[in-house]
Regions:
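N-terminal secretory signal peptides
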Residues: 1-8, 20
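Twin-arginine (Tat) signal peptide motif
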Residues: 5-14, 28
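A beta-strand edge to alpha-helix "cap/lid" segment located at domain peripheries
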Residues: 15-37, 73, 78, 87-163
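Short, well-ordered alpha-helical segments enriched in acidic and aromatic residues
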Residues: 56-72
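Non-transmembrane alpha-helical segments in soluble domains
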Residues: 14, 43, 47-50, 62, ...
Length: 163
């Protein structure tokens, strides 16, 4: 049986669509069961992690990640494996930032999975950056074990191609 290769743009689209659908479905279901204490704790870990970005302190930000965490910045980037490698990759960028802030618009938690819809703001020396993000977090034993961000395309963005 041959393996089917899926294009990054299709995978990204499905990820964003799925994350958005889950977020909206969970948010709109007034009869949903209350979240458990573990789910509340997992959501708090992610929200505290997002809040820590205002400090730009890589030790503090990294303290929320499991030692063997995996991070994928956007749907088309390769994963970065291990807390030390993740923080090394982010350290240079954060060092150049005059400010950083994650504004969580809404979040949904299901067991160990936390999804958030947020806007990330970064102020650099000569520019201000703003990204609309759907974040996927898998929390185990109070630490973020997996973190993937999916960007929301702008209205005038061109579709991604495989060429």
């Amino acid at each position: 049986m041959s393996e089917r290769q899926t294009s990054p743009s299709r995978r990204g689209f499905l990820g964003v669509t799925g994350a958005g659908a889950l977020t909206l479905a969970a948010a709109s279901d007034a009869s949903a069961a209350p979240i458990s204490e573990v789910e509340k704790a997992n959501e708090k870990v992610v929200n505290d992690f997002c809040a820590a970005w205002t400090t730009r302190d890589t030790d503090k930000i990294g303290s929320f990640l499991a030692k063997d965490a995996v991070y994928r910045m956007i749907e088309t980037s390769p994963p970065t494996k291990g807390r030390d490698a993740i923080m090394a990759a982010l350290k240079d960028f954060l060092g150049k930032a005059k400010s950083a802030r994650f504004e969580v618009l809404r979040s949904t938690v299901m067991g160990n999975t936390v999804l958030n819809d947020r806007i990330d703001y970064f102020e650099l020396e000569d520019s201000k950056l703003k990204f609309h993000i759907s974040g996927f977090f898998w929390v185990v034993d109070g630490k973020i074990k997996e973190w993937q961000d999916y960007s929301w395309p702008k209205v005038n963005d061109k579709p991604q191609t495989n060429s």
